[in-house]
Design a protein with these regions (language model features):
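Surface-exposed, charge/polar-rich loops and edge strands
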Residues: 3-35, 43, 49-56, 77-80, ...
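Extended, H/D-rich, highly charged conserved domains that either
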Residues: 61-75, 79-81, 87
Length: 247
């Protein structure tokens, strides 16, 4: 994943804060969580109107605040939401939010603190197949190429879920962003492990990238690209690594 991309007169880097005249896109990778952007509610509503949304019963979503409105609407619409525990910490690195068994409102339950109260923590093996993947980003190209916060967790989650058979070639990946986070096609280079998105949703429009996005990486974990420190920091990875016969 690249580490920086120019956005107009500003430069977005993982860990940066961007604020355009106090009126539009703003986000911060503070403690690994991207802050909500102006128009996030409208973007979530636009996503809600798509057939890909209506047909989905199970979502896998990132835990960032920018996509909280998406997670909220999923619960309101009766969808099961699997939300990654930040940094995939612990042996059960996903929250399983069941819309029929929430201890508080969908809005509160969709937050990280609310999920800790309303959801069960589950292992990867306990997840059901995923119908729609929701990811966050700092910037995204009109060709679906995305710039994350630099930790590589979204790509890693996708690889793990793909290897487990929870995500297939036809599973749609979507992000919600502000218009100022958009880059022209070709503006964000992709590494071999980077997962492009199929749909980009802004408060004002829908960009379908499926006919022009790069191919997705082959399902599975790219072990040579992971450092021993990264593997040791994520219990799920450490367990997978320990079970490899060729390690």
């Amino acid at each position: 994943m690249i580490s920086r991309i120019t956005l107009g007169a500003s430069v977005a880097t993982p860990g940066s804060v961007i604020h355009r005249d106090g009126r539009a896109a703003r986000w911060a990778a503070s403690n690994g969580i991207a802050a909500i952007f102006s128009g996030a509610e409208a973007a979530a509503e636009r996503l809600r109107g798509l057939p890909e949304w209506r047909n989905a019963r199970t979502l896998k979503a990132n835990p960032d605040s920018a996509q909280l409105p998406v997670r909220q609407r999923a619960l309101e619409d009766g969808k099961t939401v699997y939300m990654a525990v930040p940094r995939l910490a612990g042996p059960e690195p996903f929250f399983a939010l069941d819309p029929d068994h929430l201890s508080e409102s969908p809005r509160k339950a969709a937050s990280i603190s609310g999920a800790a109260r309303s959801a069960r923590k589950v292992a990867l093996a306990e997840l059901a197949p995923v119908d729609l993947v929701v990811v966050g980003c700092v910037a995204v190209g009109e060709d679906g190429a995305r710039l994350g916060k630099g930790g590589g967790f979204a790509d890693l989650e996708f690889a793990l879920a793909g290897a487990a058979g929870l995500i297939g070639p036809g599973t749609v990946a979507v992000t919600t962003v502000h218009e100022l986070q958009l880059q022209p096609a070709g503006g964000i280079p992709l590494a071999e492990h980077d997962v492009p998105v199929d749909l980009v949703i802004t408060p004002d429009r829908i960009i379908d990238c499926r006919d022009r996005r790069a191919p997705r990486p082959v399902a599975g974990i790219r072990w040579p690209e992971l450092t021993p420190e990264k593997i040791a920091a994520i219990p799920l990875l450490a367990a997978e690594w320990a079970g490899r016969p060729d390690r």
